[in-house]
From Swiss-Prot:
<keyword id="KW-0472">Membrane</keyword>
<feature type="compositionally biased region" description="Low complexity">
    <location>
        <begin position="464"/>
        <end position="501"/>
    </location>
</feature>
<dbReference type="GO" id="GO:0005886">
    <property type="term" value="C:plasma membrane"/>
</dbReference>
<keyword id="KW-0597">Phosphoprotein</keyword>
<keyword id="KW-1133">Transmembrane helix</keyword>
<feature type="region of interest" description="Disordered">
    <location>
        <begin position="464"/>
        <end position="527"/>
    </location>
</feature>
<feature type="compositionally biased region" description="Basic and acidic residues">
    <location>
        <begin position="358"/>
        <end position="369"/>
    </location>
</feature>
<feature type="domain" description="CNNM transmembrane">
    <location>
        <begin position="8"/>
        <end position="191"/>
    </location>
</feature>
<feature type="region of interest" description="Disordered">
    <location>
        <begin position="358"/>
        <end position="384"/>
    </location>
</feature>
<feature type="domain" description="CBS 2">
    <location>
        <begin position="274"/>
        <end position="334"/>
    </location>
</feature>
<feature type="transmembrane region" description="Helical">
    <location>
        <begin position="127"/>
        <end position="147"/>
    </location>
</feature>
<feature type="topological domain" description="Extracellular">
    <location>
        <begin position="92"/>
        <end position="93"/>
    </location>
</feature>
<dbReference type="InterPro" id="IPR046342">
    <property type="entry name" value="CBS_dom_sf"/>
</dbReference>
<feature type="transmembrane region" description="Helical">
    <location>
        <begin position="94"/>
        <end position="114"/>
    </location>
</feature>
<feature type="region of interest" description="Disordered">
    <location>
        <begin position="307"/>
        <end position="335"/>
    </location>
</feature>
<feature type="topological domain" description="Cytoplasmic">
    <location>
        <begin position="37"/>
        <end position="70"/>
    </location>
</feature>
<feature type="modified residue" description="Phosphoserine">
    <location>
        <position position="315"/>
    </location>
</feature>
C-alpha cells in the first residue's frame, strides 16, 4: 500500500517537520517528567539555602514549578501522550503502515524515552531551570484538563510533601559522605564521628555514660585532711570529689579540690569543716541532652545518678496502666533534682510592686511605727535576684554544721556518678585524656600510652612525703587500682582512728569521666 502524500513535495516536507517536532516534544516531556519529579522539595530547599551559586539560581527557578507536583505530573504526561499518539498518524501519511509502526516505535524508544531521560537524569537541575518558562506555558495550556485530575490525585493520595530522613538514615547518609567511605565525600573522620555522636546522644541516658559507684572516688564526711588524704587527692587528679556520709551510696555533696589548697595537713582538719557544695541527683533514665543542658547552667558539673526502685517494679509488661504511664512521663525537673535552685515562691514579685519600683513610687515608704524610710524602693530593687546565678550562690553551699545531714528517698538507689566530661565524651565518641589518666577505658582496663610518675607531682609534695618517714606506708595507698592486682583498702597504721579516704574497697577514682582511672601504681606507692 503506497503513502497518501508523494515524496519530496512541500506537504511531505511539512509532515517531516511535524514528525520531528512531535518526537522532540515527546522526548522533552519524558525527560522533564523524570528530571523534575525526581527533585524533591526538601532537596530544592537545601540547594536554595546552601547550594553553590549556580545551583541556587537553578533551584530557585524550578521550585515554583515543582511545588504542585500532581499538577506538574499531569501536565507533562498529557503532553507526552498527545505527542506519542499523534506521531503514527503523520507517519502513516508519508510511509506505508508497516513502516509507520516501525519508525514510530524506534523514534519514540530512542529519541523520545532513552536519550532524554538519560540526559535529564544527569543534568536534571540545569535542564529543568532552562525549560522552566516553557513548562509554565504548558501548565497554563493544559490547566483545564490537568487541574481536575491533579485534584483527584490530591484527594486520593494526599498532597506531596518533602520526605525528611529519619535519624538512622541521616547517620548512614553522613557516613557515606565521609572520606573513608570512598564515595567522594569530603567529611573527615572527626566530623562524621561528632555528627553521628550528636545524633546518637538523644537515644542515650545517664546510665550509658555514668561511672559506676563502685569505681567512683569519693571521701567520707569525717575523713581527716592529713598528708595522706591530700596526697591521695593530688594523685587522683580530680577537680571535684563527692562526699558521702557513712554509706558510700549516701552521697550528700561535693568538695572542690581548689578549696583545699590552703589546708594545713598537720592540723588534720575534718572534711566536714570545709566548705562543701550541694550535688544534683539525676535519674538513670534522663537523656544526656537534658543533663548537658543542666550542666551548662552552671549549677554543677557533676551529679549523682540514682535508680528509681518503684519504676523497676512497675515494668511495662506487668503494669495495668502501662500506656498511660508512658504518656505521663516525668518532667525534666523531676529527673534532675538540683537542690541548688532557688525557691520560686521566695522571689515572686507582683506586677504592681515592679511598677512601683520602675515608676519611683517605692522610693520612700513607711515603717510599722510610721517613720518614713527613704530609698526603700532602691533596696527592694537590689534585693530582687538576678536570673543567672553567680558562682558564690548561698543556695549551692552545704552547711553541715548548722543543718542536718541531707536525707534522700529510700526508693532512690545511687548507682553512679556522671560529669560533664562523660557527656562530652559520648558526644565526641572519643575519650578525653588528661595528665592523670592511666586507662583509656576503666572497664576494659586499656592502658594509656603515658606513664604517670612521681616527677609529675609538685616538688613540695614529694619532698614532704620523703621527709615524713613512717607517716605513710605503701599499704596506705594500696586502695588505688592497679592493672595486675585487685585494689584493697587498709587503714593507716600511724593513726588507728583515721578512716580510709576512699569509700569502697573496689573503688577506682573516676570523678571526671567514666572511662578515666587514677594514675598507675608507681605514683601512689611513692606517695
Amino acid at each position: 500500500m503506497s503513502s497518501d502524500i508523494p515524496c519530496c513535495g512541500t506537504t511531505f516536507s511539512l509532515y517531516v517537520v511535524i514528525i520531528i517536532a512531535l518526537v522532540a516534544f515527546a522526548g522533552l516531556m519524558a525527560g522533564l517528567t523524570l528530571g523534575l519529579m525526581s527533585l524533591g522539595l526538601v532537596d530544592l530547599e537545601v540547594l536554595i539555602k546552601s547550594g553553590r551559586p549556580q545551583d541556587r539560581i537553578n533551584a530557585g527557578k524550578i521550585f515554583p514549578v515543582v511545588k504542585n507536583q500532581h499538577l506538574l505530573l499531569c501536565t507533562l504526561l498529557i503532553g507526552n501522550s498527545m505527542a506519542m499518539e499523534a506521531l503514527p498518524i503523520f507517519l502513516d501519511k508519508i510511509v506505508p503502515p508497516w513502516l509507520a509502526i516501525l519508525l514510530s516505535v524506534t523514534l519514540i524508544l530512542v529519541f523520545g524515552e532513552i536519550m532524554p531521560q538519560a540526559v535529564c537524569t544527569r543534568y536534571g537541575l540545569k535542564v529543568g531551570a532552562i525549560m522552566a518558562p516553557f513548562v509554565r506555558v504548558l501548565l497554563v495550556l493544559f490547566f483545564p484538563i490537568s487541574y481536575p485530575i491533579s485534584k483527584v490525585l490530591d484527594w486520593m493520595l494526599g498532597k506531596g510533601h518533602g520526605v525528611l530522613l529519619r535519624r538512622a538514615e541521616l547517620k548512614t547518609f553522613v557516613n557515606f559522605h565521609g572520606n573513608e567511605a570512598g564515595k567522594g565525600g569530603d567529611l573527615t573522620t572527626d566530623e562524621t564521628s561528632i555528627i553521628t555522636g550528636a545524633l546518637e546522644l538523644t537515644e542515650k541516658t545517664a546510665k550509658d555514660a555514668m561511672t559506676p559507684i563502685s569505681n567512683a572516688f569519693s571521701l567520707e564526711l569525717d575523713t581527716p585532711l592529713n598528708l595522706e588524704t591530700l596526697n591521695t587527692i593530688m594523685s587522683v587528679g580530680h577537680s571535684r570529689v563527692p562526699v558521702y556520709f557513712r554509706n558510700p551510696t549516701h552521697i550528700i555533696g561535693l568538695i572542690l579540690v581548689k578549696n583545699l589548697l590552703a589546708v594545713d595537713a598537720r592540723k588534720e582538719v575534718p572534711l566536714r569543716k570545709m566548705s562543701m557544695r550541694k550535688i544534683p541527683r539525676v535519674s538513670e533514665t534522663m537523656p544526656l541532652y537534658d543533663i548537658l543542658n543542666e550542666f551548662q547552667k552552671g549549677h554543677s558539673h557533676i551529679a549523682v545518678v540514682y535508680k528509681d526502685l518503684d519504676e523497676q517494679e512497675q515494668s511495662p509488661e506487668t503494669s495495668e496502666n502501662g500506656i498511660e504511664r508512658r504518656k505521663n512521663k516525668k518532667t525534666k525537673d523531676e529527673l534532675f533534682k538540683d537542690s541548688c535552685r532557688k525557691p520560686k515562691a521566695q522571689f515572686e514579685v507582683s506586677e504592681k510592686e515592679v511598677f512601683k519600683i520602675e515608676t519611683g513610687d517605692a522610693k520612700s515608704g513607711k515603717s510599722e511605727n510610721g517613720e518614713e524610710q527613704q530609698g526603700s524602693g532602691k533596696t527592694s530593687l537590689l534585693a530582687a535576684p538576678a536570673k543567672k546565678r553567680h558562682r558564690g550562690c548561698s543556695f549551692c553551699i552545704l552547711d553541715i554544721e548548722n543543718t542536718p545531714i541531707p536525707d534522700f528517698p529510700t526508693n532512690e538507689e545511687v548507682v553512679g556518678v556522671i560529669t560533664m566530661e562523660d557527656v562530652i565524651e559520648e558526644l565526641l565518641q572519643e575519650e578525653i585524656l588528661d595528665e592523670t589518666d592511666e586507662y583509656v577505658n576503666i572497664h576494659n582496663r586499656i592502658r594509656v600510652n603515658m606513664h604517670a610518675s612521681p616527677e609529675n607531682l609538685p616538688s613540695v609534695i614529694t619532698s614532704i612525703t620523703q621527709s615524713s618517714s613512717g607517716s605513710t606506708s605503701p599499704n596506705q595507698t594500696s586502695h588505688m587500682a592497679t592493672p595486675d592486682s585487685s585494689p584493697t583498702t587498709k587503714p593507716s597504721n600511724s593513726s588507728p582512728t583515721r578512716k580510709p579516704s576512699v569509700s569502697s574497697p573496689t573503688r577506682e577514682p573516676s570523678d571526671s569521666s567514666h572511662s578515666m582511672a587514677p594514675k598507675h601504681e608507681e605514683s601512689t606507692q611513692t606517695l
